[in-house]
Amino acid sequence: MTRIHPTAIVEPGAQIDESVEIGPYAIVGPHVTIGARTTIGSHSVIEGHTTLGEDNRIGHYASVGGRPQDMKYKNEPTRLVIGNRNTIREFTTIHTGTVQDAGVTTLGDDNWIMAYVHIGHDCRVGNNVILSSNAQMAGHVEIGDFAIIGGMSGVHQFVRIGAHSMLGGASALVQDVPPFVIAAGNKAEPHGINVEGLRRRGFSPDAISALRSAYRLLYKNGLSLDEAKVQLRELASAGGDGDAPVAALVAFVDASQRGIIR
């Protein structure tokens, strides 16, 4: 049976699973869908065309599904889609997409979103991502699986942050961070491979060694980006555990529109 506090407002049209819990003074809009066993904290607002999957935990005073902070927005029915088992802590803001992009902001599964985080319109956040307190994502930002964003960091619009990368606290990021790389500073610069994170996630010593070699080619050997990519492609075909992650790094660099941190 759905547990809805008597002071909460659930507008007609909202689709709420019977196992959902909604706390005091929370507001759920008419175009919202909430999946099984999700908990909505007190005073939080879930609005817009928002879909929440199963087993999510929304902290008190969170604002989820609000209008995009884009002056071109004209009340189009753009969306926010959130997966399963996400923790979204107090005072977080997550906005719906815009028609200038795909019209949807997405958050995958098993993410840990700490207090006061902002996820802007059209962002695409993968799975198992950690966004530390007060991390701020501008519109159209992409964050790969298992990335970690330090507290008080600011990320420029359209920036891509690769899988398994890490951005240090209080950083200002204006260009893409390749997968597996640690970045920090204002403005953010590369600081090596995220070795400890890769070990924790089961990457083999050979794969980590290959990624360290890739990092040296990209950042330490004095090569131009085009020269580095030629040698990176050779490294990605060496026939070891490192082939796949190095190939993923090369593909990310090839696809960069804003350029990578250097």
UniProtKB/Swiss-Prot annotation:
Entry annotated with the keyword Cell membrane: no
Catalytically driven reaction(s): a (3R)-hydroxyacyl-[ACP] + UDP-N-acetyl-alpha-D-glucosamine = a UDP-3-O-[(3R)-3-hydroxyacyl]-N-acetyl-alpha-D-glucosamine + holo-[ACP]
First-listed, main subcellular location of the protein, grouped into a coarse class: cytoplasm
SUPFAM superfamilies documented for this protein: Trimeric LpxA-like enzymes
Biological process according to GO: lipid A biosynthetic process
Protein origin, superkingdom: Bacteria
GO cellular component: cytoplasm; membrane
UniProt KW keywords: Acyltransferase, Cytoplasm, Lipid A biosynthesis, Lipid biosynthesis, Lipid metabolism, Repeat, Transferase
A GO molecular-function annotation: acyl-[acyl-carrier-protein]-UDP-N-acetylglucosamine O-acyltransferase activity
Pathway as given in its UniProt record: Glycolipid biosynthesis; lipid IV(A) biosynthesis; lipid IV(A) from (3R)-3-hydroxytetradecanoyl-[acyl-carrier-protein] and UDP-N-acetyl-alpha-D-glucosamine: step 1/6
InterPro entries in UniProt: Acetyltransf_C, Acetyltransf_C_sf, Hexapep, Lipid_A_LpxA, Trimer_LpxA-like_sf
CDD domains per the UniProt record, alphabetical: LbH_UDP-GlcNAc_AT
Places the protein is found: Cytoplasm
EC number(s) per entry: 2.3.1.129
Short name of one Pfam family: Hexapep
Keyword flag Acyltransferase: yes
Family named by the database record: Belongs to the transferase hexapeptide repeat family. LpxA subfamily.
Role of this protein: Involved in the biosynthesis of lipid A, a phosphorylated glycolipid that anchors the lipopolysaccharide to the outer membrane of the cell.
Subunit structure: Homotrimer.
Cross-referenced HAMAP family: LpxA
Protein name: Acyl-[acyl-carrier-protein]--UDP-N-acetylglucosamine O-acyltransferase
Organism, scientific name: Burkholderia vietnamiensis (strain G4 / LMG 22486) (Burkholderia cepacia (strain R1808))
